[in-house]
Amino acid sequence: MLSRFIKRTYSTQTSSPVVGIIGSGPAAFYTAHRLLRNDPNVKIDMFESRPVPFGLVRYGVAPDHPEVKHVEHKFSEIAESTQFRFLGNVNVGTDVSLRDLTKNYDCLVLAYGAAGDKRLGIPGEDLSGVYSAREVVGWYNSDPRNQNLELDLSQVEDAVVIGHGNVSLDVARILLSNPAQLSPTDINPLFLKSLERSNLKRLHIVGRRNIFSVSFTIKELRELFALSSAVFFAPSFNYSTKWMNETDASGLDRPRKRLLKLLVSEIQKAVSEKRVAPYSKDKKCWNLEFGLTPVEILGHKGNVENVRFQITDSIRTDAESKFTTIPAQLFIRSIGYKSMPLPGMKDVGVPFDDAKGIVKNVNGFVRPGIYTSGWVKHGPIGVIATTMMDAFATADTITKDWKSKKEFLKNSKLGWDGLKKNIKTPVIHWKDWKVIRNAEIERGLRHESLSEKFRSNEDMIKLIYPGKK
């Protein structure tokens, strides 16, 4: 049955392909860019479940990193192509089925990213005051999906962030920043008000493994050390001598050695100045912990109060204790995002690996006529530059397969024109997105900020469709 479904004739392959891309983040746009560069006559329809484009560039990049968002200008150039169509506020799997897409496109590219979270799976993870980094990032970036967080920073003196990646450092930096320095950015003004009331005194960025396993980069680490509103304090024990052992560092690459040198230098400086845990002064304080695995989040009256850790790094001078506890009224896990399957994938022969959180593929190829790109292809790793190269590779595979007359989807080649009559949701086109964006810039001018994003999908849709309910 499945073989009959995916079989196609090659009679329509004399022309350029009609491609449907699901998602509108970096992987999606870079795939579109490369496809258009390989063949200027390719037609691309890009489906996005939100009313607005750009995915994690819009809702994941820290507001104090506006230079990273400059890539939006490149994506906008792509979207202005006459061969390109943006279809926002269209949920693939609910508003339109994957099966219907296969009937109208030569090729589909799954590039919808990772909207789920990995969990620790420990007792207390559902207590009030426990959040994923994605939720907190979404809150301060005005993501409509994360505007109901009941997080009152005025009630927080101690915070724990689990994870040693760049997202962890981003979250920590924002929580430790001076609100006045963030106000000119496009940060959520409601978050900013909460930050102004913050009573945060100590923030611990905790890693389950040792220093050699950190995923963050030296740029993000330097930004934390450079904060004028916060001061770094060392743990009550000193790793430094062991960390500087040439035997331990001999297998590290140059960037990791530079990072290690910076970190050890700052720890030694903190120790010499007697800035050791539980250090406290007028400024907010933060530190990095290694070799601590959370085993239980302890609460009081439904709220997080302490976090119990197992000590797993023998380098620690307190390793004989086996366990340690850190106070926390805020616990943020930053251990990775996770892609989720789209409804109807099995119906069209798309295999999804639930354990890995990816679409099963071979170098982006899923099955004839269906490909994948970005985090849903290989997992939530890499920066925008690596996503670009990965997306280019998928696009090149599609172009090569098309020119080689390999199997693609048997379809009408109508694309969106074959689907739109059955779509009930109000669709946001590229011209509509520009109206939304201009309105956000105007909103920002009132607060002397870069822009003020809409915090609800409904408000964006009402702006374009005033009469819609």
Curated annotation (Swiss-Prot):
The keyword Electron transport belongs to this UniProt entry's keyword annotation: yes
Gene Ontology MF annotations: FAD binding; ferredoxin-NAD+ reductase activity; ferredoxin-NADP+ reductase activity; ferrochelatase activity; oxidoreductase activity
Subcellular location: Mitochondrion inner membrane
Transit peptide: 1-38
EC id: 1.18.1.6
Keywords annotated in UniProt: Electron transport, FAD, Flavoprotein, Membrane, Mitochondrion, Mitochondrion inner membrane, NADP, Oxidoreductase, Transit peptide, Transport
SUPFAM superfamilies per record: Nucleotide-binding domain (SSF51971)
UniProt-listed InterPro entries: FAD/NAD-bd_sf, FAD/NAD-binding_dom, Ferredox_Rdtase, Ferredox_Rdtase_adrenod
Catalytic activity, reaction form: 2 reduced [adrenodoxin] + NADP(+) + H(+) = 2 oxidized [adrenodoxin] + NADPH
Cofactor names: FAD
Amino acids binding FAD: A27, E48, L56, V92, W375, G382, V383, I384
Pfam families (UniProt xref): Pyr_redox_2
Biological-process GO terms, alphabetical: [2Fe-2S] cluster assembly
Major localisation: mitochondrion
Binding site for NADP(+): H164, G165, N166, V167, R208, R209, E220, G382
Mode of membrane association: Peripheral membrane protein
GO cellular component: mitochondrial [2Fe-2S] assembly complex; mitochondrial inner membrane; mitochondrion
Functional description taken from the UniProt entry: Adrenodoxin reductase transfers electrons from NADPH to adrenodoxin, which is involved in heme A biosynthesis and in iron-sulfur cluster assembly. Involved in the electron transfer to heme A synthase etp1(cd), a heme protein that catalyzes the conversion of heme O to heme A. Required for the de novo synthesis of Fe-S clusters on iron sulfur cluster assembly protein isu1. Involved in electron delivery for Fe-S cluster synthesis. Essential for coenzyme Q biosynthesis. May be involved in the electron transfer required for the hydroxylation reaction performed by coq6.
Protein family according to the UniProt entry: Belongs to the ferredoxin--NADP reductase type 1 family.
Protein name: Probable NADPH:adrenodoxin oxidoreductase, mitochondrial
Organism: Schizosaccharomyces pombe (strain 972 / ATCC 24843)
Lineage: Eukaryota, Fungi, Dikarya, Ascomycota, Taphrinomycotina
